[in-house]
A protein has these predicted regions:
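C-terminal hydrophobic helical "lid"/dimerization subdomain
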Residues: 3, 278-326
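N-terminal glycine-rich cofactor-binding segment
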Residues: 5-21, 36-64, 79-80, 97-108
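Glycine-rich beta-strand-centered segment in the early N-terminal region that forms part
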Residues: 21-34, 47-90, 130-134
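Mid-domain Rossmann-like dinucleotide-binding core that forms the NAD(H)/NADP(H) cofactor-binding site
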Residues: 75, 135-211
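NAD(P)H dinucleotide-binding glycine-rich loop of Rossmann-like/cofactor-binding domains
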Residues: 86-167
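A short acidic, Gly/Pro-enriched loop at the edge of an enzyme's catalytic core
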Residues: 214-222
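Glycine-rich phosphate-binding loop and adjacent beta-alpha segment
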Residues: 229-290, 326
Length: 326
């Protein structure tokens, strides 16, 4: 089978032995397509992932072989996520599922940039779902990233009618804005790139150049979906006293100045949000199926053989998001 692996400073496609169940519980699935996540790029660029690693976790796939108590059968087209919480540890009991050690240890191997992958019984029972018939394969690949966003929106715990500002209108920012709207917020998005602002508007979300936001604008919640260093200063400028800042991106390096006094005197709440629980994923799929979050036009399709170009085009901002079709 063909698979894309990290080879020093590039991603190469090579042929490897087919994978088989060999009596294991779970399923072998034939990958239809897999979205390229920002975390895949971070792992590649900063050499977090080793040579030989197969990245990719935003998977849409067809069940090829199965030995499972789950209700799926051969030929079913499914979406899945890659991490599963234990539900029993101190982190899970406090709702911090992405800090769970079991959550961190579970993954899809090889990753989704491969013709076939193995899904454990645990994956099938907890985070896999039939693909809704009204979604294309490419649209369904947003199941996992939108799950991350649903978690961030829930953690903010804003109430209906609250004002929310999304700082950074890449694919995650645009999805975040739509999810916030679906949860009843009054949403504004901002960015520096005109094409991203216009794309956001095409989804019915108010958006503007960040430099054109009125000084008097105030939001109950700020969602930092950009990793730019200036995003934190934008968040501090426009969050109301007593408001919330949701950090939903990584930065190239730690910020040099921690805004301690602003947080202290203004009673701000600053929180991070990382990865979804199975419940968040259920809600994500419902938002996609019901059309409350639309994704068509956000991603650009590439073949597996062109995966290096997909990485390069994403990193150079030629495209917003890549979808690798196998």
């Amino acid at each position: 089978m063909k698979t894309a692996v990290i080879d020093n400073d590039k991603i190469i496609v090579k042929n490897v032995d087919d994978i088989k169940l060999n009596g294991r519980k779970g399923a072998i699935v034939k990958v239809i397509g897999c979205g390229l996540c920002g975390s895949d790029i971070v792992k590649f660029v900063h050499k977090i992932a080793r040579n030989g690693t197969v990245l990719g976790h935003e998977i849409v796939a067809e069940i090829f072989d199965i030995n499972s108590a789950a209700s799926f059968k051969k030929g079913d087209v499914i979406v899945t996520s890659h991490h599963i919480p234990c539900g029993e540890c101190v982190y899970c009991k406090h709702g911090n599922v992405s800090m769970c050690e079991h959550f961190k240890s579970t993954n899809i191997r090889p990753g989704g940039f491969s013709e076939y992958v193995y899904l454990s019984e645990e994956h099938l029972q907890n985070v896999a779902h039939l693909k809704p018939e009204n979604l294309t394969d490419e649209e369904a690949s947003f199941y996992e990233p939108l799950g991350c966003i649903v978690r961030a929106v829930k953690r903010a715990n804003l109430i209906k009618g609250d004002k929310a500002l999304v700082v950074g209108l890449g694919s995650i920012g645009i999805l975040t804005a739509q999810a916030l709207r679906a949860y009843g917020c009054d949403v504004m998005g901002c960015d520096l790139l005109a094409e991203r602002i216009e794309l956001t508007k095409s989804f019915g979300i108010d958006a503007c150049d960040v430099r054109e936001l009125p000084d008097e604008y105030e939001a109950d919640g700020i969602f930092m979906t950009s990793g730019a260093d200036k995003a934190i200063s934008t968040a501090l400028k426009y969050v109301r006293n007593g408001g919330k800042i949701i950090v939903f991106s990584s930065t190239p390096s730690d910020l040099s100045a921690y805004p301690n006094n602003e947080i202290y005197y203004r009673e701000l709440t600053v929180m991070g949000s990382y990865s979804p629980s199975p419940v968040d994923l259920n809600d994500s799929l419902a938002l996609l199926k019901e059309g409350k979050v639309k994704v068509r036009g956000i991603s650009t399709e590439y073949k597996l053989d062109d995966i290096q170009k997909a990485f390069d085009d994403t990193m150079s901002n030629k495209i917003m998001k890549a979808y690798i079709k196998l």
